[in-house]
Amino acid sequence: MPPRELSEAEPPPLPASTPPPRRRSAPPELGIKCVLVGDGAVGKSSLIVSYTCNGYPSRYRPTALDTFSVQVLVDGAPVRIELWDTAGQEDFDRLRSLCYPDTDVFLACFSVVQPSSFQNITEKWLPEIRTHNPQAPVLLVGTQADLRDDVNVLIQLDQGGREGPVPEPQAQGLAEKIRACCYLECSALTQKNLKEVFDSAILSAIEHKARLEKKLNAKGVRTLSRCRWKKFFCFV
């Protein structure tokens, strides 16, 4: 019997290649500019540092102009908030006003244990804001709330012949008078209500931008209490 001829086995047919799944393009990042104003030494820098970097400045250093950037998620969409820390001293009035245009939201800050800083909200800060930016929302923020019941602070106020801490109802009344979005008290040291301040600022800015772009639907923006909220980066 003649030997059988061996033939090379044909390779099995390759399975049809399937294209890799397409990655969903990331939603565009929304940018928000938030400017903090108020008298010197009321704790504006401390608010920003405590919120963005989870730290607390060990000593007071007057600010000329600093910016911080944080990325967060709101309803799954990336939002980058730029926090502008301004100087409260008169020497920086001209420099400070340069950052007011294109601001999406202002935090008008006063210390609850410095009545003069509260008085300056209506005498200086609100007029200055509205001169350069008449439409952006304003939040009234009472800082250093942890000192409201501090015995040493109360003694110093009494010995100096100054008024006591600013009553919360009085601050609430001012917020209504100046048509601020809300009034919030917070502490950079203990971080009490700190997140709520910036949550409210971001929400107010988003709604303001939506109104300007005429894209705010009937339901509006969901409250941040229902949103997934994550902080990613801090750039100083």
Curated annotation (Swiss-Prot):
Sites bearing Phosphoserine, chain numbering: S25
Purpose: Plays a role in the control of the actin cytoskeleton via activation of the JNK pathway.
Localization (cell): Cell membrane; Endosome membrane
Designated gene of the protein: Rhov
Annotated lipid attachment (S-palmitoyl cysteine): C234
Cellular component, GO annotation: endosome membrane; plasma membrane
Record's subunit section: Interacts with PAK2.
Record note on what altering K231Q does: Loss of subcellular location to plasma membrane, decreased association with endomembranes
Outcome (variant: K230Q): Loss of subcellular location to plasma membrane, decreased association with endomembranes
UniProt similarity note: Belongs to the small GTPase superfamily. Rho family.
Named cofactor requirement(s): Mg(2+)
Protein's membrane topology: Lipid-anchor
Lineage: Eukaryota, Metazoa, Chordata, Craniata, Vertebrata
Gene Ontology biological-process annotations: actin filament organization; endocytosis; establishment of cell polarity; signal transduction; small GTPase-mediated signal transduction
Compositionally biased residues, Pro residues: 10-20
Tissue and organ distribution: Highly expressed in brain and testis and at lower levels in spleen and lung.
InterPro entries, sorted: P-loop_NTPase, Small_GTP-bd, Small_GTPase, Small_GTPase_Rho
Region span, Disordered: 1-28
Organism (species): Rattus norvegicus
Sorted UniProt keywords: Cell membrane, Endosome, GTP-binding, Lipoprotein, Magnesium, Membrane, Metal-binding, Nucleotide-binding, Palmitate, Phosphoprotein
Annotated protein name in UniProt: Rho-related GTP-binding protein RhoV
Domain of life of the native organism: Eukaryota
